[in-house]
Amino acid sequence: MGIGIPDVHEAWTWYRKNLNMDVPVFEEAATAALMLPYTGGKPHDRHAILAMNMQGGGGFEIWQYTSRTPVAASFEPKLGDLGINICKIKSPNIKAAFADFDKTYLLSKDIETTPNGLKHFFVKDPYGNIFQIIESDEWFTDRGDTTGGVYGAILGVSDIEKSLAFYTTVLGYDEVIWQGEGQFSDLNSLKSGKSNFKRAILTHSKARKGGFSPLLGKTQIELVQNLDEKGQNIYEGRYWGDLGFIHLCFDVIGMKSLQEECEAAGHPFTVDSANSFDMGEAAGHFSYIEDPDGTLIEFVETHKIPILKKIGWYLDLTKRDALKPLPRWMLKSMGLNRKKD
């Protein structure tokens, strides 16, 4: 999950303390030269940190403009506005997570239950970003933390049927766990959460493949269409990288064939690093597409990753079977880079 932030180091401190996102994969200050369609046609400088929670789940790309002041939305986004509304964070113990969470940031008064029976609650970080802490029983390792990594996202859409077609085919979220329409009590703590919604919760029926699949695990995409209030585009009049959830990122294998599939589906790459980008400590090939409402989806095919930076141990992923998971001991070794406060 990409998160536009006013102060990258201050934000990472908060995410370490509250969400245990404490293992850095890379940290780099550089110029974002390829995102011109979304940065006003000009390259801009930025500082980014990719941080993971080694219990399992996806990571945060914590992203700060340094050549301009990042801009907040001119309105307070409501549930169903177009774009990434909420980041899902999985938890091995939802009761303990709720009890332990700093009450300053809780939105939910109590633990709620999703329509498909999962316990969850909502929190808001100091920058206005909302996270759904949701129970999961799939884990890479047990560190004793009450939260894990990214489990997916809740996306506001204008036409749920059109978005379902996109996410079930182009992104492979082919299993509809639950779909319905109405008012949902588990959303009441959110702005406009008492509205009528069309709502669908998706996952993928096939086990994930690739080097990092044991760590990243299964994910969910939840689509919400507000039937009472028209959704506004959360990034209207702003740049990618401005404050908020800037993109949803997927680890992929075979960028060229993926490009062909996306073009055939009517969602061509809008940004393509063409061959390889170098983030200093990590390298790979990245591209972007837009969902039917213009929400940005990033694909990254990783070529190089740091395993243990202290001794200069980096793994070249281009020299191994891309579909085969990395050994668990090797993935766990990344945890030795953990930053402790």
Predicted segments, located by residue:
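A common structural junction motif
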Residues: 103-108, 174, 265-270
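C-terminal functional regions that serve as terminal interaction/effector modules
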Residues: 8, 203, 208-209, 215-226, ...
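Core segments of cupin and vicinal oxygen chelate
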Residues: 4-57, 113, 156-218, 280, ...
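Vicinal oxygen chelate
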Residues: 1-7, 44-67, 71-100, 119-124, ...
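Short glycine-/small-residue motifs
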Residues: 59, 132-133, 296-299
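Short, structured interface segments
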Residues: 61-65, 117-143
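N-terminal beta-strand motif that seeds the catalytic metal site of vicinal oxygen chelate
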Residues: 1-12, 22-28, 82-89, 135-164, ...
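Short amphipathic alpha-helices in soluble, non-transmembrane regions
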Residues: 13-18, 99-104, 168-169, 260-265
